[in-house]
Design a protein with these regions (language model features):
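Interdomain hinge/lid region at the active-site interface
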Residues: 168, 172, 222-284, 290, ...
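NAD(P)+-binding Rossmann beta1-loop-alpha1 motif at the extreme N-terminus of oxidoreductases
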Residues: 1-69, 94, 163
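Active-site-proximal catalytic alpha-helix in oxidoreductases
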Residues: 135, 140-143, 163, 168-199, ...
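Rossmann-fold dinucleotide-binding core
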Residues: 8, 101-180
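Hydrophobic beta-strand scaffold residues
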Residues: 31, 52, 120-122, 163, ...
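Rossmann-like NAD(P)(H) cofactor-binding subdomain of soluble oxidoreductases
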Residues: 39, 56-61, 65-66, 70-138
């Protein structure tokens, strides 16, 4: 990928994909995009002055590198191998960077299927949310052959910092396990705020203390005041996506004969919130369920 910048075909300009694709356009990469939501695709194309691809096959034919960032592995399979998929039109020697939070075993299968066509696929899911997607400061967990990752590094570096995780599928495994840790930290942190509030400590004070103490985590730093205590619940990451990632993490445990009772409990709590609050509720709204169970509300909307 040395010399002229490779042409990129970007599949999925949703909450995460749109700012990531925008970063690549700003960096000077020739980029075409496809999204199955025509209105969303048209809005992105108009904002960034690009022509949307009419079909996945059209996108594949004119791209050196394909980036997919989609809701789940089933949709990735449809994009690649479905009746309207792009696999048959991918150029030999092209690369697919699979940035969905996907199922590792399916990612391995996708890679093997495309290898027979002379196409490389490796997984590179991201962490950091929409704010860091906008600034190109995501954490990228890359699983695959190191030579393939190295060749794509100029593209990946536009989007964030890359940590190679090992063989194909390990990036997706690491993403799911990261969200397992993150989701557990969120739940226990909210319970601590509820307990402390009932005792008489101001929630904002508790967050301040946690952030300079050993209880600090991503949720105490970037979620509790911003989305829960403010009552905004609009981080941009939906409840069903969290449940999906936790299901993947638990599946990895089961496939590897690991007894993981806390992971199982964590996943069940989030699945319960998903059932009660709805799959499109923001994941930070899980705090509402904890509040309902305790009979107390923490935080309040800012005064207008």
């Amino acid at each position: 990928m040395a010399g002229l910048k490779p042409s990129i075909g970007f599949v999925g300009v949703g909450a995460m994909g749109a700012p990531m694709a925008a970063c690549l356009i700003k960096a000077g990469y020739p980029l075409a995009a496809y999204d199955n939501n025509p209105e969303r695709m048209a809005a992105f194309a108009a904002e960034h002055g690009i022509e949307p691809a009419a079909t996945l096959g059209e996108l594949a034919k004119k791209s050196d590198v394909i980036i997919t960032i989609l809701p789940n592995s089933a949709i990735v399979h449809e994009v690649l191998f479905g009746s309207q998929g792009m696999a048959a039109d991918l150029r030999p020697g092209s690369v697919v960077i699979e940035m969905t939070s996907g199922i590792p075993s399916q990612t391995v299968a996708f890679s093997q299927q495309l290898a027979g066509r002379g196409v490389v696929l490796f997984d590179a899911p991201v962490s950091g949310g929409v704010p860091r997607a906008r600034t190109g400061e995501l954490t990228i967990m890359a699983g695959g052959e190191q030579a393939d990752i190295d060749a794509a590094m100029p593209i990946l570096n536009v989007l964030g910092s890359v940590i190679p995780t090992g063989k194909i599928g390990t990036g997706h495994a690491m993403k799911a396990l990261n969200n397992l840790v993150s989701s557990a930290g969120f739940l226990i942190g909210i319970e601590a705020l509820i307990i402390g509030s009932r005792f008489g400590i101001e929630p904002e004070t508790m967050v301040d203390v946690l952030n300079v103490s050993t209880g600090m985590n991503n949720s105490t730093q970037k979620k509790f005041k911003q989305y829960v205590l403010s009552r905004k619940f609009d981080s941009g990451f939906a409840m069903n996506l969290m449940v999906k990632d936790l299901t993947i993490a638990l599946g990895i445990a089961h496939e590897n004969n690991v007894n993981a009772p806390f992971a199982d409990l964590c996943r069940n709590l989030w699945a319960g919130a998903n059932a009660v609050l709805g799959p499109q509720a923001d994941h930070t709204a899980v705090a509402l369920l904890s509040e309902q169970l305790a009979g107390i509300q923490i935080g309040k909307p800012p005064k207008q």
